[in-house]
Amino acid sequence: MVNHQTVGDRATHLSPEDLAALREILHEQRLFRQDQLRQIAAAPRAEELLGRRSAAQAEVHVKLAASARMVLADVEAALQRMADGSYGTCHLCRRAIDRERLTIVPQARYCARCQQVREAGR
């Protein structure tokens, strides 16, 4: 189901075309992260066969995989929000996330203001 979100001004309004383009970007990101995870999983086996896997390399692989899984989960969640009609709404203040922000970070859960507040609290 594609939602036509009318929030008010053009900065926050997501047209059906905007949603379709963002959905395509999210699908591409999902495929990229899935492929990245496959490559990360395959790399240690190849290194072990060659007997060249160091502890530092293993740690890098673990951190890369964790990061890829986290981004993949964010992408999957964004696609689910698109499906259920809540995409583009900030999880904290419930206001619309600016179209420009979603274009840059299509999996964004928070508007720029709430994201800054969250990051300042860390």
Q: Which positions does each model-derived feature cover?
A:
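Interaction interfaces in information-processing and related assembly proteins
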Residues: 1-84, 122
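Residue-level signal for mature regions of secreted extracellular proteins and peptides
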Residues: 83-86, 104-107
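Cys/His-enriched microdomains
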Residues: 88-91, 109
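Short, cysteine/histidine-rich loop/knuckle motifs that typically chelate Zn2+
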Residues: 92-93, 113
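Hydrophobic alpha-helical segments of small multi-pass membrane proteins
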Residues: 95-97, 110
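Short functional micro-motifs and their immediate structural scaffolds
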Residues: 97-98, 116-119
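Short Cys/His-rich "knuckle" micro-motifs
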Residues: 100-105, 121-122
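Cysteine-rich micro-motifs
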Residues: 107-116
